[in-house]
Design a protein with these regions (language model features):
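Short, conserved secondary-structure transition motifs
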Residues: 130-142
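Positively charged, Gly/Ser-enriched RNA/tRNA-binding surfaces
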Residues: 8-29, 37-38, 61-72, 77-124, ...
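Acidic carboxylate-rich catalytic motifs and surrounding loops in phosphoryl-/glycosyl-chemistry enzymes
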Residues: 33-36, 129-132, 295
Length: 295
């Protein structure tokens, strides 16, 4: 079914305005990344095209695009709002990235900002599952040849794929136990400490949570609402030339499906003849008022 672009844009405009205001309050600056860039093996997603025998990527994953353009000068606090392409499929996202020398602080800050955004949008029934790639890598160290099969099983949460592997029953049981480990605590210090520092009962340890993007280093997380059939966002930590980074992206179209728009009634309605009414409206705007011109 063809989307009503104008109606959906009105909803996204309201959502994005709220998100921008929160991120500005947290001291983040918006980054404007070029839509078309020379193809680079480090870029993820995007639409790959050729032009005059040169290869380009259109709207690639912003985290990988920032990594390609990384320069010194910490801390770096940036956010972006744009459509991300994966082939010809596109999704509108709002994302943030925080790079600094403190690998604990950046995760705690990022997750607190996530809370601020979702509460501002009155999406208070969210929950966040936090997992660890490093735990899985250590667990499968002695069966590396099945790494791709195991991570496919994790992404699909399909135990039968693990069941079919020619590995010992003890190892299968260890993998199943990790895959099903979910709760307020998990017994792994890095995750338990992070949940304690964020101090919000909507955050859970979930070792079955994995993210396919290759730049994630260890901690990853997914954001859910019971009103949405898919995650409304996701993120994780990574390293960039020795610097610790953490960020997340929100799926604006998924959020639009569950966001309840409240009618704005704080506009000053201005009418009258064109010359006088628009002069008055301009003065009101300069004084910080919001105006709506009567037609």
């Amino acid at each position: 079914m063809k989307k009503d672009v104008f109606s959906e844009s009105e909803r996204l405009d309201i959502i994005v305005s709220e998100i921008r205001e929160i991120l500005k309050r947290w001291g983040y600056q918006e980054i404007f990344l070029p839509s078309v860039v020379e193809h680079d093996g480090k870029l993820r997603k995007g639409l790959n095209i050729t032009c005059q025998n040169e290869f380009y990527s259109v709207n690639p994953d912003p985290t990988s695009q920032m990594a390609v353009n990384f320069r010194d000068g910490l801390p770096i606090r940036k956010f972006y709002i744009r459509e991300i392409l994966d082939g010809i499929e596109g999704k509108f996202q709002a994302g943030i990235e925080f790079l600094c020398d403190d690998p604990v602080r950046n995760k705690v800050e990022i997750l607190n900002i996530l809370i601020s955004i979702l509460e501002r949008l009155k999406i208070e029934d969210f929950y966040v599952d936090i997992g660890s790639l490093k735990i899985w890598k250590e667990t499968i160290e002695n069966i590396k040849e099945y790494r791709d099969d195991i991570f496919t099983a994790l992404r699909r949460r399909n135990l039968s794929l693990i069941d079919d592997l020619p590995i010992s029953s003890e190892k299968k049981e260890e993998l199943w136990d990790l895959l099903n480990l979910r709760g307020e605590k998990c017994g792994f210090d890095k995750i338990d400490r992070l949940i304690d520092l964020v101090d919000d009962d909507r955050f859970y340890a979930d070792l079955g949570t994995v993210r396919p993007l290759p730049y994630y280093d260890d901690i990853i997380f997914e954001i859910y609402s019971p009103r949405a059939g898919f995650p409304i966002g996701a993120g994780g930590e990574y390293k960039l030339e020795g610097t610790h980074g953490c960020g997340f992206a929100l799926d604006l179209e998924m959020i639009s499906e569950i966001y309840n728009i409240e009618e704005e009634n704080d506009f000053v309605v201005v009418d009258g003849d064109l010359k006088t009414s628009y002069r008055r409206a301009r003065g009101l705007v300069e004084d910080g008022e919001k105006v709506r011109m009567e037609i």
